[in-house]
Amino acid sequence: MCLMKTFGEIIRSKREEQNLLLREISALTSIDQSVISKFEKGERKPSREQVLKFAEIYKMPQADLIISWQSDKVAYELIDENDVEEILKVAESKVKYLKTIKK
């Protein structure tokens, strides 16, 4: 999996590699084809459950698609910020801290 591709680019390329139409994926996932099209174009964000459906359909490791989906959310949130690296360092530290107090 290419780490630079967005979630939408990944699911579109997988669909095209398997020569599947949007309507076929729609039938397999129970997600409207217009919604899938918006996922592929990055115009709409799927839920975790929907991401897992795509992983199953395309026979991809769930972790790969979850990482792509989550990293897209972070990237889009930070795209206009100036101190991205510092924000990510602090966020990583906070995640580690929160995991220790969550136990």
For the regions a language model picked out, list residue spans one by one.
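Interfacial/linker helices and their anchor residues that mediate assembly or domain coupling
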Residues: 67-103
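Short alpha-helical DNA-recognition segment
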Residues: 19-38
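DNA major-groove recognition helix of helix-turn-helix/homeodomain DNA-binding modules
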Residues: 30, 47-64
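Residue-level detection of the helix-turn-helix DNA-binding "recognition helix"
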Residues: 16, 30, 41-43, 70
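A short, Lys/Arg-rich alpha-helix, primarily the initiator
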Residues: 1-17
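The alpha-helix within a helix-turn-helix
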Residues: 15, 26, 55
